[in-house]
């Protein structure tokens, strides 16, 4: 799930690529999203007809995909704490905003909390008979979190649109009066970059939400087809990787 914290725009830095990569890989989300890319890229290959079913590599790809899926769950250990802290540090202007924050962070936090037990069932410590109902709770909590997350981000996008209109009006007035507006131009550029990241983040949540609905419906329906879900997962992973890369 995409984190609901505001997207930060940082100015490009002249950084050594390997140093930047080291910083990226030192983060939990950095490694997790690379695993997510490899998993869903593998699922796309398996869902397509690129490799005949009779080839010996198919069982190995299926084993790899399954192992990566279990490995990713280990990265969720304790991750629910970030949602608790995010909710504690949040600010709101109305009860409506507070409800959205509770839905978003509460849903995601419960999802990450339950995922720890799912990992323990996959690892064999907890009896596998508990796996199905734990996965249902996890999926519903995740879906609730996405509803709150998308709602908050749409609200933020509207605020950015209002801010963009205000800055555009200021620039127009400055130009008509023959005044310099370098500061406003830079501000407009920053707003547009924030809007781009916000839109990508919304699309990422929608893609992840589609996969969650497929889990709830046990893979039934046209939108739950393996190639559709795999493509949504890969898109989400690439967006997350991009956001994590530019933020570190």
Swiss-Prot record:
Q: What is known about the tissue distribution of this protein? A: Expressed in developing siliques.
Task: Indicate yes or no for the key word Membrane.
Answer: yes
Instruction: List the InterPro entries hit by this protein, alphabetically.
Output: PEX11
Q: Does the keyword Transmembrane apply?
A: yes
Gene Ontology terms for molecular function? identical protein binding
Q: Where does the record say this protein resides?
A: Peroxisome membrane
State the conditions that upregulate or repress this gene.
Up-regulated during senescence.
Segments in the Lumenal topological domain:
119-220
Keywords (A to Z) from UniProt = Membrane, Peroxisome, Peroxisome biogenesis, Transmembrane, Transmembrane helix
Q: Which residues lie on this side of the membrane: Cytoplasmic?
A: 1-97, 242-248
Membrane-spanning ranges: 98-118, 221-241
List the membrane topology term(s): Multi-pass membrane protein
Where does the source fall among the domains of life? Eukaryota
The record ties this protein, via Pfam families, to: PEX11
Q: Subunit structure, per the record?
A: Homooligomer. Interacts with ARC5 and FIS1B on peroxisomes.
Described by its record, this protein's role is as follows: Involved in peroxisomal proliferation. Promotes peroxisomal duplication, aggregation or elongation without fission.
The family classification in the record reads: Belongs to the peroxin-11 family.
Protein name stated in the entry:
Peroxisomal membrane protein 11A
- Write down the species: Arabidopsis thaliana (Mouse-ear cress)
């Amino acid at each position: 799930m995409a984190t609901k914290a505001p997207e930060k725009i940082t100015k490009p830095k002249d950084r050594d690529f390997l140093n930047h990569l080291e910083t990226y890989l030192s983060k939990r989300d950095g490694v997790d999203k690379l695993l997510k890319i490899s998993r869903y890229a593998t699922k796309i290959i398996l869902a397509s007809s690129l490799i005949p079913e009779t080839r010996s590599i198919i069982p190995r790809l299926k084993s790899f995909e399954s192992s990566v899926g279990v490995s990713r769950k280990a990265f969720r250990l304790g991750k629910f704490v970030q949602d608790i802290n995010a909710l504690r540090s949040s600010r709101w202007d109305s009860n409506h905003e507070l409800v959205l924050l509770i839905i978003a962070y509460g849903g995601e936090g419960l999802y990450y909390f339950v995922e720890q037990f799912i990992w323990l069932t996959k690892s064999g410590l907890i009896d596998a008979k508990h796996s199905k109902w734990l996965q249902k709770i996890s999926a519903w909590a995740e879906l609730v979190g996405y509803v709150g997350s998308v709602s908050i981000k749409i609200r933020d996008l509207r605020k950015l649109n209002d801010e963009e209109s205000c800055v555009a009006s200021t620039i127009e007035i400055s130009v008509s009066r023959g005044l310099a507006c370098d500061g406003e131009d830079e501000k407009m550029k920053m707003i547009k970059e924030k809007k781009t990241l916000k839109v990508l983040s919304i699309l990422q949540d929608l893609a992840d939400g589609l996969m969650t609905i497929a889990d709830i419906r046990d893979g039934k329906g046209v939108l739950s087809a393996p190639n559709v879900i795999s493509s949504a997962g890969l898109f989400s992973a690439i967006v997350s990787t991009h956001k994590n890369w530019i933020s570190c």
